[in-house]
């Protein structure tokens, strides 16, 4: 049946109600619902809607409004029961805001934002006005959900139904089987015990008879076998001990001693060849000093085993070896002593040559005289001085040749002054005189003397350098005289210009 709609006024809100009328029994129509039932439904709904509208207004005027949440699970319906009708009320949120169209008559009214759905059904055990009979309790106990009789009589065979049937069969079997199984077990256990008793008695008798017949023979055989083994072991052990004792006393010990002597003699000969007789003597002396008790014990033991002739031969051979080593070592020791004495003398000569030579005043004076003679020779040798000055001193401009006799006199005076200044510079410089004695007095070969002569010539050249400056200073008055003569002055310090 199609739902009927009506409006309920609660304060300033108009609440829209959707009424659904449920059918009664097998009847598809809703003839049982009358206008009296409608008035009763309106009064019941108004009493339920007033607290709902009041709650909505209070929540609206609050400062902090809670956001509406979408409830996925539907709330339980509100059940109301009247005299002739039963109601189930559902409140559903409307997502569209509705307004009143006619504002003149309904200016103050507002549409409630929730929709109300009401399901009406007749109450149980109540007489309907249309002459329908009351329903029996027995008929109401069965479910009338399925309208067709075939569906109710033959329900669908689902998986749950099949499972239930299987479980019922299993339960029936378990109820019947336990007593039978107990009886079978008891009978089987009784038979098994009887069989075991018979078998046990028979096996015990058989074992007793067998042991009575077999044990005496086995005991005799075991005793005979063990006694034979024990006697054989005794005989083998006795013969083995006797043989070991005889061989040890008679044969084994002498052979071991001979082998030890041969190995020791081979080692001694190898030591002689490698390290010489001196090392062997040191070893023999150490052994005799460090091992006296052991050697005495060994000699006593060997003397008890060997005859006296063999011990005497061994002592003689040892003495002969010591004498040979003493004869061999003497020439070697003499040669070593001579070689060491020669090395010591050479070392003493080298040390004496390296010692510093004392310097005396007479040696210094002799060196000064030698330098004076060498400087005079240098003044006579014009070419040597000029070449040396050209190589060591600054380059000077060549003077023009003069034909007058004044130049020859000037050169003679210059040479004399050079010789005097060299002697004075040598006497004033004590360092040059002190450095020379080491080279003169030291015992070195001719090569060192040639090197000393070269050093002396270099020292002489160094002593000539200041003389050139002195001669240039002393020759100033001669240059003034030449100016007075009218000749132009030529500067010696200027260099030739490159053309």
Curated annotation (Swiss-Prot):
Biased composition regions of type Low complexity, renumbered to the chain: 421-432
Residue spans of biased composition, Basic and acidic residues class: 478-490
Location of region: Disordered: 142-203, 250-276, 288-341, 375-499
Highest taxon above the source species: Eukaryota
Residue stretches of biased makeup (Polar residues): 142-162, 179-194, 250-268, 441-456
Family membership noted in the UniProt record: Belongs to the SLX4IP family.
Family annotation (PANTHER family): PROTEIN SLX4IP
Protein name as catalogued: Protein SLX4IP
UniProt organism field: Danio rerio
